[in-house]
Regions:
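Mid-sequence acidic-hydrophobic segments that form the walls
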Residues: 77, 99, 103, 114
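Basic/polar phosphate-binding segments, predominantly the helix-turn-helix DNA-binding elements
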Residues: 29-62, 85-107
Length: 326
């Protein structure tokens, strides 16, 4: 393993360790000294490498992650504010309030009374991003079959940002990063704070486990994709059809009517070694599917939405809009 590869993995291990300690309430282990010792490097060197790779100070990252977990409890439970503060390593109600307001511009009590969208510090995934950038560390074959089935999805709303020119996940976020307030960290943090997401499985990362999905919307102004369909790429969350909560100003929301979809699904996979193989396998399955025999065809009507769920702990799943041909 190269030194660069090794340090991306080291920082990823630190990030995972931080979340484990916060979740378990093991605050004594959540120190720079212990994290550095576990890697066999000095505190100074680990701090420097963390900042270099993640783009932020390690102590700041730990504080923001504590606040992100605390905010979810404020939003989703009736636990007392002081109890939440102490559970997440703050010494008093006042210390928690100061840190919370400095991070989100609102006090914990005001947020609980009126939970507006705020930018949470989602868990960073430096090693995953590095692997995607270099195409992974291997091309292990996946032995799982692709499941193909049809579903009817009820009417819902889709809160999102969109881009009419991007080509794929990385290009999407690269282009969005040049739009004020629409970079990946800001958007994922805002979406993480939204309550009531239909696909939220309680995950702590900015992926399908926390309800965040990539989508492709049939739009005549969009780029022509490899399937010959003009699409706008989008990123957001599905919400109930009657959702009436506040909406971040840089996002848009659309009504998605009830419709029929075809699903191409691969089960859990190892991101580091199987991601590329899973992508190739599921792309081939979509290419080979015989729509004529099924009695369905892809629905290219403007506004139909094609969802992409990527959560290596559960599945890789494409959900494409269809309509009956007979």
């Amino acid at each position: 393993m190269s030194e660069i590869n090794e340090w991306y993995m080291n920082i990823q291990n630190i990030v995972d360790d931080i979340d484990r300690c916060i979740k378990s309430g093991d605050d004594e282990k959540l120190t720079l000294g212990r994290l550095s010792k576990s890697l066999g490097y000095s505190e100074y060197y680990v701090s420097r490498k963390f900042s270099e790779i993640s783009g932020m100070n390690l102590r700041d990252y730990m504080r923001y992650r504590r606040l992100a977990f605390a905010l979810r409890e404020l939003r989703d439970t009736d636990k007392g504010i002081l109890d939440i503060a102490l559970d997440y390593g703050f010494t008093s109600h006042e210390a928690f309030t100061r840190a919370f307001k400095a991070a989100y511009g609102i006090t914990p009590s005001s947020y609980r009374s009126h939970p507006v969208p705020v930018i949470l510090r989602t868990a960073i995934r430096p090693f995953d991003c590095y692997l995607l950038g270099i195409g992974g560390t291997g091309m292990a074959q996946t032995n799982s079959d692709i499941k193909v089935y049809f579903v009817t999805i009820p009417a819902h709303k889709f809160l999102h940002i969109r881009n009419y020119e991007s080509i794929g996940y990385y290009d999407f976020w690269e282009k969005q990063s040049h739009i004020p307030g629409q970079d990946c960290a800001t958007i994922c943090g805002l979406l993480d704070s939204i309550k009531g997401k239909l696909d939220d499985m309680g995950g702590d990362e900015a992926d399908s486990g926390s309800g965040q999905v990539m989508a492709y919307i049939n739009e005549p102004e969009g780029r022509i994709c490899s399937w010959g369909i003009p699409l706008a790429e989008a990123y957001g969350v599905r919400l109930p059809a009657d959702y009436s909560g506040e909406m971040p100003k840089q996002m848009q929301i659309m009504d998605v009517p009830e419709g029929e979809y075809i699903v191409f699904e691969h089960g859990p996979f190892d991101f580091q070694t199987e991601n590329s193989a899973v992508e190739a396998k599921i792309e081939q399955a979509m290419k080979d599917f015989d729509y004529e025999k099924s009695g369905y065809e892809l629905d290219k009507t403007q506004g139909r939405v094609f969802y992409f769920y990527h959560d290596c702990k559960r599945y890789w799943k494409y959900i494409r809009p269809v309509r009956k041909t007979v």
